[in-house]
């Protein structure tokens, strides 16, 4: 590898896939890449791969891929059998949104909530802002005012 890898997607477990697709689209502007699919253990290549990934307890899940502005996607999972993922999940996803306060307000107004009481500067006296929220399903979303590279470049 000659440089850092590109982030391609973040997997997020939700309890209602259809609602999550609408929520991530309406609130944050993500767009479905294709239709939602159902994957069953032992059903075709996808079922074989999923059974290998999730182990013998896996039965089936529903899945959707949502496109973001910079090519990084969100991969939504609704585990049906068993009804939730039995492994530890991600801590958070981070989205560069520009107007952190406005997006945090939209999240809180549509079934999510703010975890931090305010929008914080990441560094004192600099324009890079952050706020932690939760989506309508309890997953942590960190909001950035700028890209990760711009925020963290040239730090000692």
Predicted regions and their residues:
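Vicinal oxygen chelate
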Residues: 1-3, 7-15, 35, 60-75, 79-108, 129-134, ...
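Short secondary-structure boundary/capping segments
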Residues: 2, 54-56, 65-66, 84-85, ...
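Core segments of cupin and vicinal oxygen chelate
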Residues: 13-70, 102
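Short, glycine/acidic-enriched loop or turn micro-motifs at the edges of active sites
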Residues: 19, 78, 145
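Residue-level detector of anion-binding/catalytic polar loops
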Residues: 31, 73, 113
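A short acidic/small-residue loop/turn micro-motif
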Residues: 40, 81, 147-150
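Short secondary-structure boundary micro-motifs
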Residues: 48-51, 79, 114-118
